[in-house]
């Protein structure tokens, strides 16, 4: 079993930039990463290894997770892959997680709200911030598609292959 906390969340968090991840709690971060991972798995076309997963709920006690029932107060969803995925599959999933992270950033108007309203204080342009993040999302989406295209054209022995689906 590969727990998402280990194989997806840590590499994802290491590659993104954003102040929000410095001010939210560990539980909020894990819940957000869980939702991004589910979207990334759904977006991954034709993985050669099944990306089926199981969900469980846990609460944090000091530095460990304790599995609990879904209805328990403070329970955070976590996931693990039933099959062991390779680096290539994980790389594609992390790339899609980045796309959905920027998309989520853009969809929240609070991220672009002016903090100051005084006419004497110069602040950044909200339009420029939105434009910059839109371009970033397009770059991440192009990168994710390129990774997925390269992934689908090479088999496990690194030979050229088109159409090998779940046969390894």
Language model regions located:
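Eukaryote-specific, cytoplasm-facing alpha-helical/coiled-coil scaffolding segments in long proteins
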Residues: 119-130
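Conserved short "hinge" loops at termini or chain/domain junctions
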Residues: 1-85, 146-168
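Short, solvent-exposed secondary-structure capping/transition elements
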Residues: 49, 53, 102-114
